[in-house]
């Protein structure tokens, strides 16, 4: 008896050729319905219509096509079970050997901003039911859910009877397919109706296995969405991205996004930003009138730490900037665009990873961050990139000058992306000292102020958390700091305010903290 394939696909890529090969090489009969049947018939492929197979017409405007005992009985029947054999004969079931199904494009529908009713109609019911039935009975039935599986199935079939291990792998991929589909639906309903979900469910396909994790003895994998973020970035040259590269690129990019992100010639004067990052901490940052000057300014902050670092730009990288970049060892450079001449210059550094990530490849919606803990996950909103000065208050007798306000705003944005406890010293829209990841705030201040040294005179200081004591203000004064920005909120705020007033230092409270762990 000829094997029977049930074919019902939304994505019709390669389906005609696949069905032709099933018929010509393996003597399959094709069972199909709706748009798939029409598509195959138009291609002169013989098809048994589901309505004729079940002797039951589609109802409810096509909502019920394949939800029928003759379909699911044919898929779920155990070939060697005596009781099943009795039911097969009693119900005149024809066994189905292959299920080829992919689902209504729900993700595509909601990504296009579909209305609630339209999205609901694009929730597939019959498809997941057939996929799950076939996957459950994979000992006897093969299930294909993606056109990329067709060729491999044909090659395996040429070897003779399909191995159980191969069919089990297909079943795994099928259940992952339906799980991903249900995840998209549940997350969409939660978002649309503002419900707090009782379960945190996310589905990310495997992008690739990485060489190793943070250290060579750790395995690592990269999962993500195919149409957004780093997986959609175009790597123009260089070695494969590592686990650490991806972590650092993410930190560098989120920092530079504080200052806008634009294609060539779209930025206004003095908004070109460059961030140099090492081990998930900025080691230099600047905003200037060109990308090349911004990079040079950032490099001046800590040229030693920049060695082997990551550089991010919020603007096009031109040849002048490329000349500056090629003179030091870097792991990665990311920007929205690169001039052809710049790429020619950078090609001499064959191992340098160059990534082009355009503005339309950035996430459009608010994101969440996730951290693993023993037995669970911590999920929070990301610390958004829209830092505004509304709500900031001057708490001292002296107010910052216009230039100081620019520097305070700049330093505050950078400080947000430095590991806590964090202190950033800035002057003329560039960092001159950064103290990161210290267990006490004055310790971070000592590192940042010592790094900046004499350049501190007239500079500003930013702190990601409040001052528990006035010691940080006292230390800042010794180095010549003239303005401070911090969240405020300490029980001893007045001591810091009094110290600022006594030393002639301006201080701003943002009333917003930016811890980063």
Curated annotation (Swiss-Prot):
Pfam families: AICARFT_IMPCHas (PF01808), MGS (PF02142)
Associated pathway: Purine metabolism; IMP biosynthesis via de novo pathway; 5-formamido-1-(5-phospho-D-ribosyl)imidazole-4-carboxamide from 5-amino-1-(5-phospho-D-ribosyl)imidazole-4-carboxamide (10-formyl THF route): step 1/1; Purine metabolism; IMP biosynthesis via de novo pathway; IMP from 5-formamido-1-(5-phospho-D-ribosyl)imidazole-4-carboxamide: step 1/1
Residue ranges occupied by any MGS-like domain in the UniProt entry: 1-145
Gene Ontology MF, one: IMP cyclohydrolase activity
Catalytic activity from the UniProt record: (6R)-10-formyltetrahydrofolate + 5-amino-1-(5-phospho-beta-D-ribosyl)imidazole-4-carboxamide = 5-formamido-1-(5-phospho-D-ribosyl)imidazole-4-carboxamide + (6S)-5,6,7,8-tetrahydrofolate; IMP + H2O = 5-formamido-1-(5-phospho-D-ribosyl)imidazole-4-carboxamide
KW Hydrolase (keyword) present: yes
Family: Belongs to the PurH family.
Protein's name according to its UniProt entry: Bifunctional purine biosynthesis protein PurH
Gene behind this protein: purH
């Amino acid at each position: 008896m000829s094997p029977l394939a049930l074919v019902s696909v939304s994505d019709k890529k390669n389906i005609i050729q696949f069905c032709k090969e099933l018929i010509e090489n393996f003597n399959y009969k094709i069972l199909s319905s709706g748009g798939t049947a029409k598509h195959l018939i138009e291609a002169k492929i013989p098809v048994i219509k589901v309505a004729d197979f079940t002797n039951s017409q589609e109802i409810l405007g096509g909502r019920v096509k394949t939800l029928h005992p003759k379909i699911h009985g044919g898929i779920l029947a155990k070939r060697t079970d005596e009781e099943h054999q009795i039911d097969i004969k009693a119900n005149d079931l024809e066994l189905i050997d292959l299920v080829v199904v992919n689902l209504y494009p729900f993700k595509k529908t909601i990504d296009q901003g579909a209305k609630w009713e339209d999205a609901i109609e694009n929730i597939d019911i019959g498809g997941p039911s057939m996929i799950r039935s076939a996957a459950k009975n994979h000992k006897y039935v093969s299930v294909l859910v993606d056109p990329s599986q067709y060729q491999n199935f044909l090659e395996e079939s040429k070897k003779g009877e399909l191995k159980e291990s191969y069919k089990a792998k297909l079943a795994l991929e099928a259940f992952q397919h339906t799980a991903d589909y249900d995840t998209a639906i549940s997350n969409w309903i939660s978002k649309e109706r503002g419900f707090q979900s009782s379960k945190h469910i996310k589905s990310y396909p495997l992008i690739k296995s990485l060489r190793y994790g943070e250290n060579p003895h750790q395995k690592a994998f990269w999962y993500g969405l195919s149409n957004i973020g780093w997986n959609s970035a175009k790597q123009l040259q260089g070695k494969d991205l590592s686990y650490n590269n991806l972590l650092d690129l993410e930190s560098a990019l989120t920092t530079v996004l504080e200052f806008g992100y634009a294609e060539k010639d779209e930025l206004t004067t003095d908004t070109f930003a460059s961030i140099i990052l090492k081990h998930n901490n900025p080691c230099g940052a600047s905003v200037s009138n060109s990308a090349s000057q911004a990079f040079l300014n950032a490099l001046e902050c800590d040229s030693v730490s920049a060695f082997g670092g990551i550089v991010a730009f919020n603007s096009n990288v031109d040849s002048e900037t490329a000349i500056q970049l090629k003179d030091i060892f870097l792991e990665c450079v990311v920007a929205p665009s690169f001039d052809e001449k710049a790429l020619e210059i950078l090609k001499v550094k064959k191992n340098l990873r160059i990534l082009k990530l355009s503005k339309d490849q950035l996430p459009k919606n608010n994101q969440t961050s996730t951290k693993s803990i023993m037995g669970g996950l911590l999920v929070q909103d990301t610390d958004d990139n829209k830092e505004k000065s509304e709500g900031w208050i001057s708490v001292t007798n002296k107010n910052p000058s216009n230039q100081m306000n620019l520097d305070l705003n700049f330093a505050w944005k950078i400080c947000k992306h430095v590991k806590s406890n964090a202190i950033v010293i800035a002057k003329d829209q560039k960092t001159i000292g950064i103290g990161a990841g210290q267990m006490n705030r004055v310790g971070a201040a000592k590192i940042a102020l010592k790094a900046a040294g004499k350049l501190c005179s007239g500079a500003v200081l930013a702190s990601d958390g409040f001052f528990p004591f006035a010691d940080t203000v006292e230390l800042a004064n010794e180095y010549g700091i003239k303005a401070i920005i911090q969240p405020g909120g300490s029980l001893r705020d007045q001591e810091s305010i009094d110290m600022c007033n006594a030393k002639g230092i301006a201080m701003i409270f943002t009333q917003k903290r930016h811890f980063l762990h």
